[in-house]
C-alpha cells in the first residue's frame, strides 16, 4: 500500500516512554474489563469505551487545533486501523472468562514478534540473523504457552493469538500514518468507529451462532449499567483512551522494530495483577513461554540498538575528519 505521508521524526526515547506508560494503562484497563465481563457483553464494553473516548477527544481536538484538523487524506488507513483494533481486542477480551489473566496476555504477546516481522515485510526494516534467531525462540515460547496437542489445550487460546496478529498490523498502519495527523486525531479515528464495528461483529456472531449460557459475555445485548458499575465503565473508558493515545504516539515517532520489545513490560504487570486480584498462579508452561518471549523481545531490542549505532558510525566516518566536530542527534540511540 503506497500512501503519501509526512516523514515522521525519529524520537526513540520519547517513544519508549510513551510505550511504557501505555502498558501500565493497558494492564489497568484490561483488569477492569475482566471484572466487568462478568456482567456485560464484550461488545457493550468496547462500544462504551469508544463513546467515552469520542466524547472527550472530539471537543478536545476542535479546541486545540480546530475542526479542520479532523480532515485527513489518510482516512482509509485510519479505518483499517480501527477495524484491526476493534476486531482483535474483541477476541482478546472474549478469552478472559475461560483463561487466566496472565495466560491470555502471554499468548497475546506474540504481537511484538509479529510486529518485527511485519515491519520487515511492509516497512523494509531489516531483520538480521541474530534477531531472526531471537524471533524463532520467541515463537517457541508462544507454542509452549499455548500447548497445542496437550490435554490442557483450550481452543480459546487461539483468540488472543489472532488479536496479536491484528495488533501488530495496526502498529504498522500507525507507522504509515506517521505524523501527518496528530496523536489525538489518530486516537479518535481508532476508537470512535469501534462503537459501530463491534456492534456489527456482535450482531453477526449472534445471527449465525446460537450461543450457550457459558458465552453470555458474547451475546448481543446492551443492558443498562447499574449504579455500582457505571463509574467503573467510565474509568475504564478514560484509561483505555489514554492507553491508545500513548501507544499511537509511540509508534508514530519511533521504528516499530525498536518499540515492539518494550511491549513486554505488560507481562510481569499482568502476572502480578492476576495473582493479587484473582489468586491466579499460571501453570509452569505459561512461565516458561513467558520467559522465552521476554528474552526474545529484549534481545531483538538490543540488536536494534547495536544496528542503529553501527549505521550511525558508518554514516559519520567518511564525512568527518575529527569525531569531536561531528554533530550528534539529541534523540539518537
Sequence positions of predicted segments:
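C-terminal transmembrane-helix exit sites in multi-pass transporters
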Residues: 111-136, 268-287
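Transmembrane alpha-helical segments that form core, pore/gating elements
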Residues: 152-214, 223, 311-333
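Loop-to-transmembrane-helix transition segments
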Residues: 14-20, 67-91, 155-161, 212-242
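Helix-helix packing/entry segments at the starts of transmembrane helices
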Residues: 105-110, 177-193, 241-275
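C-terminal-most transmembrane helix of multi-pass membrane proteins
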Residues: 2, 268-333
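Hydrophobic transmembrane alpha-helices of multi-pass small-molecule transport proteins
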Residues: 130-147, 163, 285-304
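Hydrophobic/aromatic residues within transmembrane alpha-helices
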Residues: 36, 45, 49, 95, ...
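Transmembrane alpha-helices of multi-pass small-molecule transport proteins
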Residues: 2, 14-15, 40-87, 166-170, ...
Amino acid at each position: 500500500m503506497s500512501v503519501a505521508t509526512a516523514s515522521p521524526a525519529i524520537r526513540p526515547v520519547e517513544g519508549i516512554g510513551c510505550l511504557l506508560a501505555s502498558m501500565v494503562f493497558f494492564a489497568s484497563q484490561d483488569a477492569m474489563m475482566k471484572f466487568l465481563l462478568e456482567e456485560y457483553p464484550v461488545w457493550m464494553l468496547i462500544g462504551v469505551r469508544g463513546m467515552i473516548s469520542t466524547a472527550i477527544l472530539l471537543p478536545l481536538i476542535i479546541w486545540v487545533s480546530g475542526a479542520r484538523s479532523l480532515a485527513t487524506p489518510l482516512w482509509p488507513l485510519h479505518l483499517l486501523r480501527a477495524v484491526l483494533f476493534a476486531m482483535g481486542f474483541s477476541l482478546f477480551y472474549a478469552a478472559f472468562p475461560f483463561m487466566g489473566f496472565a495466560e491470555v496476555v502471554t499468548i497475546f504477546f506474540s504481537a511484538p514478534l509479529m510486529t518485527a516481522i511485519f515491519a520487515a515485510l511492509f516497512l523494509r526494516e531489516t531483520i538480521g540473523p541474530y534477531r531472526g534467531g531471537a524471533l524463532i525462540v520467541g515463537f517457541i515460547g508462544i507454542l509452549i504457552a499455548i500447548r497445542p496437542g496437550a490435554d490442557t489445550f483450550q481452543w480459546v487460546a487461539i483468540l488472543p493469538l489472532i488479536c496479536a496478529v491484528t495488533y501488530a498490523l495496526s502498529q504498522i498502519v500507525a507507522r504509515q500514518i506517521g505524523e501527518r495527523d496528530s496523536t489525538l486525531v489518530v486516537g479518535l479515528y481508532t476508537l470512535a468507529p469501534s462503537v459501530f464495528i463491534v456492534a456489527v461483529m456482535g450482531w453477526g456472531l449472534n445471527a449465525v451462532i446460537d450461543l450457550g449460557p457459558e458465552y453470555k459475555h458474547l451475546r448481543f445485548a446492551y443492558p443498562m449499567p447499574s449504579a455500582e458499575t457505571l463509574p467503573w465503565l467510565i474509568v475504564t473508558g478514560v484509561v483505555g483512551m489514554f492507553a491508545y493515545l500513548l501507544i499511537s504516539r509511540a509508534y508514530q515517532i519511533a521504528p516499530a522494530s525498536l518499540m515492539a520489545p518494550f511491549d513486554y513490560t505488560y507481562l510481569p504487570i499482568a502476572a502480578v495483577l492476576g495473582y493479587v486480584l484473582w489468586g491466579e498462579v499460571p501453570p509452569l508452561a505459561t512461565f516458561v513461554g513467558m520467559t522465552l518471549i521476554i528474552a526474545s523481545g529484549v534481545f531483538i531490542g538490543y540488536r536494534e540498538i547495536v544496528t542503529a549505532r553501527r549505521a550511525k558510525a558508518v554514516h559519520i566516518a567518511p564525512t568527518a575528519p575529527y569525531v569531536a566536530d561531528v554533530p550528534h542527534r539529541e534523540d539518537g540511540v
